[in-house]
Regions:
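C-terminal secondary-structure termini that scaffold catalytic or DNA-interacting sites
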Residues: 16, 27-50, 54, 58, ...
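A short, basic/aromatic helix-end/turn motif that makes direct DNA contacts
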Residues: 6-12, 121-127, 137
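Key DNA-contact positions within bacterial/archaeal DNA-binding proteins
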Residues: 2, 118, 130
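Generic alpha-helical secondary structure signal
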Residues: 16, 20, 51, 79-87, ...
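Short, charged phosphate-coordinating catalytic segments
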Residues: 1-20, 25
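Catalytic-site neighborhood detector that most strongly recognizes the C-terminal catalytic loop/helix
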Residues: 25, 124-150
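Structural detector for helix-capping/boundary residues
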Residues: 2, 7-10, 83, 105, ...
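Short, basic (Lys/Arg/His-rich) helix/loop patches that form interaction surfaces
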Residues: 42, 50, 56-75, 82-122, ...
Length: 165
């Protein structure tokens, strides 16, 4: 949440479709990221790109911060949670959860859809895939085969391919 709170337009590269994570905002104070591994470039999906274009049209000339109030001051995630997030969850009849948990949802959905685990780890600011598999893989049923059949199919396919050359 501190990365979102501290996101500034100078760190949004529309041309390369990247969000550069360089600073965080904690209690209205800009700070460097928690760890050197947290400094990263996040790839913008088409939906994120489109949403940020719309946000830029709405607030780009108003503030250096991507997410700001009418005065141009950065939004505080606590205020957004209280005024928007939790009421929206109640309205939709969903179980209450912290906005930060959307991070877990994203990781789980990326894994379930077959995205490259190294790419996911980089997007999330992990320096290795270890944390990714430790925390998130348990939420994805049948993420990996446990009987060796995938390797066997690969070998059979490879050997059959060699016969035809």
């Amino acid at each position: 949440t501190a990365e979102v709170d501290g996101l500034q337009w100078k760190y949004v590269d529309f041309e390369r479709r990247q969000i550069l994570i360089r600073e965080t905002l904690v209690d209205y104070v800009l700070e460097t990221t928690k760890t050197p591994g947290s400094v990263r470039e996040i790839h913008m999906s088409q939906m994120v790109y489109d949403a940020l274009i719309n946000q830029f049209e709405a607030t780009g000339s108003q503030s250096e911060f991507v997410f700001c109030n009418k005065k141009g001051n950065p939004l505080r995630h606590r205020d957004v949670s209280k005024r928007i997030w939790y009421p929206a969850l109640r309205y939709m009849g969903l179980k209450s959860r912290k906005p930060y948990q959307t991070r877990h949802t994203a990781a789980t959905l990326w894994l379930a859809s077959g995205e490259n685990p190294e790419w996911i780890a980089r997007q999330m600011g992990h320096t290795t895939t270890r944390m990714l598999f430790t925390v998130y893989s348990r939420f994805v049923p049948n993420l990996t085969r446990k009987d060796g059949s995938a390797f066997e199919r690969l070998m059979i396919t490879t050997m059959k391919g060699d016969d035809h050359e």
